[in-house]
């Protein structure tokens, strides 16, 4: 029993060892498979996301969709997300959906005339649309009335389409501006028509005619008739006529400009002092008349005055009348005494010792204190003693020069810049 028990014990030990090894191996295999599966899942998920991202990038944005022209036939039509529903993260566009989008945009890419034909008379599209076109909200009661009539079935003004509404509103604003300017014209016309009965009657007729409207228009636009009653053509014609009438009526009332005075150029106008007998006065009168005639003729031609002679015409251009010589009509020269012009008195005679006023000599300095004293015989009530002192200075210098000339002869004029010897000689002369 001993060896048999030992064999059983050794067999159990081997079985447990092999079982534990097999369990460990199976555990490692299972963990390895799990790792592989997880790696496969990680690789598959980015590939799926990248495919969705590429599909989303291929779809054009809303900006590209609106920037593409509807009438261009050469561009490829993008897939519309609004027509086919919103795109989700996992959806992939199939070929059937792209074909339907292509067909839809091929139908849309038509000419402008086909688009206009697709709308009925009320402005509503014939084909069914998934979304409605944007409409401008009514800003006034006039717009609400127009929209209400279009819904009821009446065809309103400018309701052919959504874009025509914009045109109608802009034209209506222009009409309002025209009304503002034309009211100013009407005020001017009323002020002018108070003086002109004809213009007033014509204005009344034009305004009454402009306010008349056809039956359906007056019924539909009774509340805002002030905008519809403006007839710009009639108003323009009326304003032009009134302005022409006012211009014709105001022309005779305007005063004519004053005539330009003709100035007769006479060289002998300033000859006021006349010396001589009656013969000289008559001679000057005749010469002044001839000069006036010549000066007045200088503005005329032979066409204006056919009585002109050749001498007078030549005198206009070639003769120069000097103040000392006057010409008669016959051509004789008359001498006028020159005493009429006052001659300028010459400078008082200077002393021989003073050559220049800028540089004073020794003689001048020595004589100024003695000469500035007023003489005894001169009256003391003279108003300007300074000027009189200068005159007495000149007189005393002349007397001194005459005395020195009588005794010592003429004294030579001194230079502006004197030497020492000349200065000493000058002192000796002044002492004598």
Swiss-Prot record:
Segments on the Extracellular face: 1-16
Residue spans crossing the bilayer: 17-37
Interaction with NHERF1: region residues: 430-432
InterPro entries in alphabetical order: PAG
Source species, domain of life: Eukaryota
Phosphoserine: residues bearing it: 50, 61, 229, 354, 380
Basic and acidic residues biased stretches: 220-230
Principal place of residence: membrane
Compositionally skewed regions (Polar residues) per UniProt: 110-122, 316-356
Tagged with keyword Iron-sulfur: no
Modification Phosphotyrosine, positions: 105, 163, 181, 227, 317, 359, 387, 417
UniProt note on tissues of expression: Ubiquitously expressed. Present in germinal center B-cells, plasma cells, T-cells, monocytes and platelets (at protein level).
Outcome after substituting residue 417 to F: No effect on interaction with FYN or CSK
Consequence of substituting residue 105 to F: No effect on interaction with FYN or CSK
Region described as Interaction with CSK: 317-320
Lipidated residue numbers (S-palmitoyl cysteine): 37, 40
Region (Disordered): 110-137, 197-230, 244-432
Keywords: Adaptive immunity, Cell membrane, Immunity, Lipoprotein, Membrane, Palmitate, Phosphoprotein, Signal-anchor, Transmembrane, Transmembrane helix
Pfam (any one): PAG
Cytoplasmic topological intervals: 38-432
PTM annotation, UniProt: Palmitoylated. Phosphorylated by FYN on Tyr-317 in resting T-cells; which promotes interaction with CSK. Dephosphorylated by PTPRC/CD45 upon TCR activation; which leads to CSK dissociation. May also be dephosphorylated by PTPN11. Hyperphosphorylated in mast cells upon FCER1 activation. Phosphorylated by LYN.
Assembly information from the UniProt record: Interacts with FYN. When phosphorylated, interacts with CSK. Interacts with NHERF1/EBP50. In resting T-cells, part of a PAG1-NHERF1-MSN complex which is disrupted upon TCR activation. Interacts with LYN on plasma membrane lipid rafts. Identified in a complex with LYN and STAT3.
Its biological purpose: Negatively regulates TCR (T-cell antigen receptor)-mediated signaling in T-cells and FCER1 (high affinity immunoglobulin epsilon receptor)-mediated signaling in mast cells. Promotes CSK activation and recruitment to lipid rafts, which results in LCK inhibition. Inhibits immunological synapse formation by preventing dynamic arrangement of lipid raft proteins. May be involved in cell adhesion signaling.
Protein name (Swiss-Prot/TrEMBL): Phosphoprotein associated with glycosphingolipid-enriched microdomains 1
